[in-house]
Amino acid sequence: LGDVYKRQAYVSAFFISKGGRFMKLFNSMSQKIEEFKPITEGQVSMYVCGPTVYNYPHIGNARPIVVFDTLKRTFMALGYKVKMVSNYTDVDDKIIKVAKECGISEKEVTEKIIKAYNDDRLALHAMMPDAAPKVTETMDAIIAFIDLLVKKEHAYVVDGDVYFRVSSVENYGKLSNQQIDDLMVGARIDENSKKENPLDFTLWKRTEEGIKWESPWSVGRPGWHTECVVMINKEFDGNHLIDIHGGGMDLKFPHHENEIAQSRAAYETGIANYWIHNGMVNIDGEKMSKSLGNVIWAKDMIEKIGGDTLRWLFLSSHYRSPLNINEEAIETAKKELNKVKTPLKQAYVKAGLAGVDLKEEYDVESFHTFLTAMEDDLNTPNAFAAIFDVVKQLNQVVRQKEIDFTALGLKVNAVEKMLDVLGIENHRIVLSEEDKNLHAEWKSAVAQKDFELADKFRAQLIEKGIL
């Protein structure tokens, strides 16, 4: 991890030491909020399950991008150095199906969707992962891992297929809070199944269809649940245990449960100390699904309302709660973001017209309040309240006839730091001499009640983003 940690700048180590600040997270494994204790002091290793790249990302896929990017930013604000890895599943039956339907190769499908996914990530102002492994580039390690499980008798081979023996590990079902007997009752029993147990899952699938590889058992491809275990091991330099494993609530079972089972079987570790899951996205109170015809692509929503507004909307609810998206929620997000950015813009303009440098000092107490909310299991609703409180104070300073620019700078810089932790884009307005002259002409026209000319100047100022 060293190279990433050396490269990465972080906001301020001040907060990690002052008053014993620490992060608290809801751990899905223990079902309670726990104090975060890193494996390596001052460092965070985090893996987030990425997409299966067969179709454009919808807004449900976009929510974890924002949630875990915000978690990373919060750790950085607390002084930690973070390595975040997020994969691409570029081997899957769905990818093969799309490739056949479109008459193109699987690689052409996956490259197109990976680009779209990264475009959406950047539009949401999310940092790129420190590593983004692909299944196709990890195949030798995947085959070696499956072979290890077979040799340890945690997996078995039937006619070229390889299955994981769930009964060989203890505590299966703990992450999803399910008992194995209950899972057995609900398991689908196929009379033609080659499995010893209905809960056993595929590690290697024998097939001649689509993209495939040679293996000791057959020509085929790996099962989904195996891929992430191997990529974690590879990307974190052979460490079988990382700090945080994240993903959507829908991945808890069976995907994450099966990852844990394999890791315990191979390495006697549970992959991660903290399991973090974000809630699902609903549309007008209904689950998003193709059958209901209410799937919204992330790129369409970004084009409609902008990446900043969508990010703000995602963060307006606690990350573990379901998020209901409708027109009312979108309008609220727009208004709230405008409520924050408008006084910032006014402050930049007034400071620029006065020739004042707002410097770097910020309202430490206000930022402390904000950070206290963020380190409490990413309590973004409380963090928003802290922002609105500072914005209220900023508005009061901006409206003064004789502006206290020291106070203005403290409030502006505090809000900027808060937005940076949330990943909300903000650019300071720097006025040129031409801008200042245009502003003076507008004020003069207003004073002389030449409203036609004033409207002309005002339109130009709005176009420049000054008003």
PLM region spans:
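Alpha-helical recognition segments enriched in aromatics with Gly/Pro capping
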Residues: M23-Y54, D69, D140-K350
